């Protein structure tokens, strides 16, 4: 993984990703503010706005459930300052013998050292919704 900054928020994002993949809700609760908002856009399941750790794990858990865990992600770039961070990610998901190869963009708003708001935008091409059917 490459990063353009060594800001402490980069480590927070890397820790959040590891906790999300392992399903560690306790770690996520320490990383997210109590009222964290998670906004999901693009051809993904559970598109919309979700609240807190439970909302986040519901969305991410659904992706892992529908793919039987066949999720490979690589952070290509993470950049951060004291309030904002961005991430560019390459993801390859497998489901029912099909692959969805996409790039995702994330924007994070921090309050102190915790994530208060997060946007996930999947840039998969039009028609990719069929992957989830």
Where do the PLM segments sit?
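Short, mixed-charge, low-aromatic patches
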Residues: 11-20, 43-46, 61-65, 88, ...
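A beta-strand edge to alpha-helix "cap/lid" segment located at domain peripheries
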Residues: 2-4, 57, 61-133
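Short, low-complexity N-terminal intrinsically disordered segments enriched in polar/charged residues
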Residues: 1-30, 34
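Charged, low-complexity, helix/coiled-coil-prone segments
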Residues: 1-9, 44-54, 104-106
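Short glycine-rich loop/turn motifs that provide flexible caps or phosphate-binding loops at active sites
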Residues: 22, 51, 96
């Amino acid at each position: 993984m490459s990063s353009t900054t060594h800001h402490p928020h980069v480590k927070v994002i890397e820790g959040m990703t590891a906790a999300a993949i392992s399903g560690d809700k306790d770690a996520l609760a320490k990383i997210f503010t109590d009222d964290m908002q998670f906004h999901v856009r693009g051809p993904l399941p559970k598109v919309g706005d979700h609240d807190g750790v439970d909302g986040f794990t519901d969305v991410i858990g659904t992706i892992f459930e529908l793919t039987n865990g066949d999720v490979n992600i690589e952070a290509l770039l993470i950049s951060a300052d004291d309030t904002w961070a961005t991430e560019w990610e390459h993801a390859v998901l497998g489901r029912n013998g099909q692959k969805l190869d996409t790039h995702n963009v994330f924007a994070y708003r921090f309050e102190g050292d915790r994530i208060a708001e997060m946007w996930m935008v999947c840039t998969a091409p039009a028609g990719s919704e069929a992957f989830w059917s």
